[in-house]
């Protein structure tokens, strides 16, 4: 049964790998046998992730990449293939958020969220997908959100970008699955990451959030690793075009 989840011999690119969910997924993949291409803008934190992965006796290539640049995305893919020989898994975890009422959202803020959460994610899929299509195999895991399923006030740009990610995932699955490339998404509920410390440490915000969350707590980043390993492994071989809810019951209401 353990072989179903084994990632030995696989090479995984993980974006947003310096901290939070991306960091935990990169390290989690390495513990199940994968070599990692860890991608982020924060080079200092990225080198810490590289060091931890190498303690698992796995290879780790740390790449500082601005995902707002398609040229840098393509360079990421080329470097990964040159250094690692192939790409088996792409986990698109990088993302941003702007907390603001819809009537106050600026064009720059809207574009910032859409450019990272949707545009750059698509071009990562395209760039790495070309390699996977030539190989005849690959797994792509996109980061959606429960807010993209049911919406959430004050998160207009974020929620709409994540809804688009789920539909993009379906569309890519329709195009690529018959060619050996499965494409799925994960939609977490509220996850307490460093980027959300300022929100979740606010008692008023946190207590209000708990009234909407059946499990009555936020997730730890490590709790998203298991679903990611499932989607990266043979355990999910017949699964494609799906968005896997890992939301503490958020969307059950």
Language-model features and meaning:
Residues 84, 137, 217-246, 251-252:
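C-terminal substrate-recognition "lid" of short-chain dehydrogenase/reductases
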Residues 101-102, 106-114, 209:
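Substrate-binding pocket helix/loop in short-chain dehydrogenase/reductase
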């Amino acid at each position: 049964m353990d072989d179903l989840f084994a990632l030995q011999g696989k090479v995984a690119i993980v974006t947003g790998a310096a901290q939070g969910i991306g960091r935990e997924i990169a390290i989690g993949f390495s513990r199940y046998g994968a070599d990692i291409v860890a991608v982020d803008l924060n080079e200092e934190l990225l080198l810490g992730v590289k060091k931890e992965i190498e303690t698992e006796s796995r290879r780790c290539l740390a790449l500082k990449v601005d995902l707002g640049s398609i040229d840098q995305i393509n360079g990421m893919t080329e470097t990964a293939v040159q250094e690692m020989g192939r790409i088996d898994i792409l986990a698109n975890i990088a993302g941003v958020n702007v907390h603001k009422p819809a009537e106050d959202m600026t064009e720059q803020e809207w574009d910032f969220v859409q450019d990272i959460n949707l545009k750059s994610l698509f071009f990562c899929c395209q760039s790495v997908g070309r390699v996977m299509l030539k190989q005849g195999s690959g797994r792509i895991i996109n980061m959606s959100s429960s807010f993209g399923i049911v919406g959430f006030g004050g998160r207009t740009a974020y929620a709409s970008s994540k809804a688009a990610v789920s539909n993009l995932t379906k569309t890519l699955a329709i195009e690529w699955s018959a060619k050996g490339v499965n494409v799925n998404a994960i939609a977490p509920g509220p996850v307490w990451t460093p980027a959300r410390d300022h929100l979740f440490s606010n008692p008023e915000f946190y207590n209000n959030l708990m009234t909407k969350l059946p499990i009555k707590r936020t997730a730890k980043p490590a709790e998203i690793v298991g679903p990611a390993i499932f989607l990266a492994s043979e355990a999910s071989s017949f699964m494609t075009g799906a968005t896997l809810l890992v939301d503490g019951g958020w969307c059950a209401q």
